[in-house]
From Swiss-Prot:
Organism (species): Amia calva
InterPro entries: Somatostatin (IPR004250), Somatostatin/Cortistatin_C (IPR018142)
Source organism, top-level taxon: Eukaryota
UniProt name for this protein: Somatostatin-1
GO terms assigned for molecular function: hormone activity
Entry's family note: Belongs to the somatostatin family.
A biological process term (GO) from this entry: regulation of cell migration
Bridged cysteine pairs (disulfide): 15-26
Keywords: Cleavage on pair of basic residues, Disulfide bond, Hormone, Secreted
Localization (cell): Secreted
Function: Somatostatin inhibits the release of somatotropin.
Amino acid sequence: SANPALAPRERKAGCKNFFWKTFTSC
């Protein structure tokens, strides 16, 4: 969870952070 601002939101969506902003662990 590199981005605490949108980490919990993207994790809920399903690892969208990969191409959302940066790499985040689901």
